[in-house]
Amino acid sequence: AAVLEARGPRPAPVEARPESVDRREMDWGTLEKVVFSTRPEFRVPAYVLLPKGLRGRAPAIVDLHSHGGMFLFGKEKIINFGANHPAMIEYHKANYAGRPTATELVRRGYVVITIDAFPFGERRLMMDEDIAAGWERAKYSIEDVRRLNRKCRSKESALVKSLTYAGLTWPGITFWDDVRTVDYLLTRPEVDASR
């Protein structure tokens, strides 16, 4: 109980209200982008990966991306899209032996969900450079990605302080997002909740 209390207040329960915003076939199966609620104030972007040829239900896993100082991308860190951003290709080689985990798990028959943890990917701190680029990460060079990641890292302490003043904690936000992600995953018709 003390560990949960240290993470800050328990957020009010919310309906996930999932919305599918994109779905495409990949060589390893189906990639669906969804957004769903984890708190009254948060809509969380996620990818759900479904194994190729899935019939019936399959075991499922929540695959959490790393921190690694890479703020510009979140859930993309653990998926092979086939045509990845050059910064992600570099990241996959350095951190995942070129084999992102979500893609490897879906190839082994798991339904996989991965979210953008706060404050990564689509949930990261917005910088002036993001606004100028129209927030399209595909337009960034590898050096742009490195520069923006350095800038985000330099703002981490201010972010933590701001959350604390608001009565929240970064680990608490992450924890409850992860709990609500499991809750949402178990509602998916492709998931065998017993496995």
Language-model features and meaning:
Residues 1-9:
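Mature N-terminal segment immediately following signal peptide/propeptide cleavage
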Residues 8-60:
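N-terminal cap/lid segment of alpha/beta-hydrolase-fold proteins
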Residues 56, 64-176, 184-187:
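Cap/lid segment of the alpha/beta-hydrolase catalytic domain
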Residues 190-195:
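Alpha/beta-hydrolase fold nucleophile elbow
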